[in-house]
Amino acid sequence: MEETLPSYEAASGAANLQEVKPQVLPLEEIKKIYKISYWWLCSIALIQTWWVLLGLLPIFFALEHYEVPYKWIFIIEMLYYELYLTLYVCWCYKLRSDFWNEAAKNRPNEERLSALGGWDFLRIPKKRVLVLRDAQSEKKQNNADASNLV
């Protein structure tokens, strides 16, 4: 006999609802999820690089004023690391958003979870709505029965 923890539905008396099973994606779908649009990444990196250049202008003028040796090496190294970091952050964000968007597309509407993000993060799953309605109707029925006894 299997030991199972009591679920939300069983605890509320709505055990007749179907159990939600996790969906396993095939390998081809997983490869599509991790496909990266390099044009998107490059455009974000270029925009970020321009902001870095604008931010480095005051540093450049300060280095020029105080005559720091090897200032060009310092500036090129900062640009290199900033570009590398920007590409890495954009790549991670793109992977994350693609993964969750694809995962949300593969689920029926009533099974979408708030953790997946998107426009339906305020949505209550249908099962919980059914459970709440059952509990409310049961409470009203109990109140009506109690008032009939008095």
UniProtKB/Swiss-Prot annotation:
The lineage of its organism: Eukaryota, Fungi, Dikarya, Ascomycota, Taphrinomycotina. This is Meiotic expression up-regulated protein 15. Keywords: Meiosis. One of its GO terms (cellular component) is cytoplasm. GO terms for biological process: meiotic cell cycle. The gene is meu15. It comes from Schizosaccharomyces pombe (strain 972 / ATCC 24843) (Fission yeast).
